[in-house]
Amino acid sequence: MSKIRTLNRQFISNLETHKAVTDAKRNLILSILKSTTTKREAKNYLTKYQNQFDLPDETPKAGTIYEQSLSRRDNQRELFIKRFLNAQNPFISIYDDEETKLQKIPLRLAIFKIKFPTISLRQWKGIAETFKRLMTLGISPIILLDYDHLSHGSFKKNELYMINQANKMLSILGKPEEQEDLKATILRNSFSVADGQITIDSLELILIPLYQGIIPIIQPIVFNADTTMQEFLKCNTLLNSLCTALVDRRTTDLLSIEKIVMIDPLGGIPSIERKQTSHVFINLSQEYSDIMSELFIGHISPKIRDLHVENLNSMNEILTSIFEKSGNDETTGIITTPEVMSIHNDQLNPIIYNVLTDRSIISSSLPSTNKRTPQLSTTIVKKGVDVQIFDQENNFSGSDFTMDNLIASKKVDKKKLTELLEDSFGKKLIVDEYYERINNRLATFILVGDYDGAAIITWEYSGDKKVAYLDKFAIAKRNQGLPGLADIIFKIILQSHPVELIWRSRKNNPVNKWYFERCCGCMSAPESQWKIFYTGDIFDKRIDRMKDKKKQNNKKKKTATMMMMNNSQKVAGVNADTHVDILKNLEQYSDICEGIVPSFA
């Protein structure tokens, strides 16, 4: 009878375990699907982070106990800790054993530099919830405390202040004995400096807590071997040194740095275009020098400017260093405020949202003048891709700016460009006819990376009207869905032709919704296969809808049907004395777009 009771209890226990595991897996997957906007994003996230979730298997897998145990994240990490403490290579006989061939489970790091003197208790509680969510999603956080605001006075006085602040932070993050609370530890004297070179004394002191699910909180204190004294260093300097040490070759299998996050009351890098709110996305390879110059033109005070310059410089140095040392260009920089980090919503918290989707909350190519485009205090930063812009004024010294001359001067590889266009559109290009048509009409050619994407803008005519026409906007299939790439190209297109730009798209093109959000208006004739989009400075975004509706009703006899997009759009020129004849423009746009022959067979 006792055996039956024992079996019954074991059966019930197994059922409860099965239910707990099933619920944990389901809840995690549902939360991910809810927070990501596309299947591609959910798939990309799960591909990278799925082995970070140490959910127990419901049924034992075939294989040895050794294989089963070491295929689990926590068991691998426990073994790593033991080997670290014994100064052994943690991967011996784990990944090199041909019979075992276990999957590596690296730490996915997010390094936070927190400047927190003005963070309120409410914000701290929200920040703690964000850290919990990040750890649930597979991120291992490291916190570096920023005390650059302290005066260079007594070391003891500053040290006491730092200890008090760190203890307050620990109490807010949670009680270690509580299962649901965060666990953190404060690390002092992690850095040493000798002959001007900063080193980390023991990387294991940082990695072992991470393997144990504990957040290391690092104080910006260094031991100066030259003076045998302790001192404080600038936090950005230590952040750079920490990242350099973590991407050392011997850590390749142990970890990857996914995010560099700067929590600063100032928020992201300010943008003139966005009326002092933050740049949404910065492609450092293309925009770094321009944005740095923009910061010095006097639209913000020198004191605030210098802090933003320091943040941008530091982010550029770190992301460049990570790329050069590890070849990883996927690390993302995030600069935001304590208030924003404390938001408890996956789709509104830019840090959590970026972990799930690897992009910013809003698209950087959305018109900043549109009232429906949110104003943000967060900037997403990437090492990014190289961009070349060819037009009569840039990167071309020939007498005639034609596609033939670009190809002849080897600035453009015709074969690669053709392959890109065919790959992007999934159709065969009518090569000779296409290049002949655009040759003498070329206005701008934009090339991204090694033919990862491109845009071709031509000059088209309707009578004596000359209009910039987006002839081709192509992204290689392998890069379609790559965060930010389409935005990078489209922003350059609009910057290259800010006054007036048109393009066409087939009515059934699923990309039309994306185009619709970025144009001033669009139109289509019932008998046409095309939807025509237009944008530019000649269209003032603040339209009186009633006046516009009245104007359309007065012109009802015309064959083209117009669909005005924006609720707040006005057909007016750039200055008050200039007005645009919208109907005439639309007729010209229609003539141009309907008259261009298809480029693909």
Curated annotation (Swiss-Prot):
One annotated GO biological process: L-arginine biosynthetic process
Catalytic activity: L-glutamate + acetyl-CoA = N-acetyl-L-glutamate + CoA + H(+)
Taxonomic lineage from the root: Eukaryota, Fungi, Dikarya, Ascomycota, Saccharomycotina
GO CC term (a single one): mitochondrial matrix
Alphabetical list of InterPro entries matching this protein: GlcNAc_Synth_fun, Vertebrate-like_GNAT_dom
Location(s), subcellular: Mitochondrion
Family statement drawn from the similarity comment of this UniProt entry: Belongs to the acetyltransferase family.
Name of the protein this chain belongs to: Amino-acid acetyltransferase, mitochondrial
Gene3D superfamilies the UniProt entry points to: 3.40.630.30
Keywords of the record: Acyltransferase, Amino-acid biosynthesis, Mitochondrion, Transferase, Transit peptide
This protein's pathway: Amino-acid biosynthesis; L-arginine biosynthesis; N(2)-acetyl-L-ornithine from L-glutamate: step 1/4
Record GO terms (molecular function): L-glutamate N-acetyltransferase activity
Main location: mitochondrion
Enzyme Commission number(s) from the entry: 2.3.1.1
Stated role: N-acetylglutamate synthase involved in arginine biosynthesis.
PROSITE patterns in alphabetical order: GNAT_NAGS (PS51731)
Domain N-acetyltransferase: residue ranges: 401-558
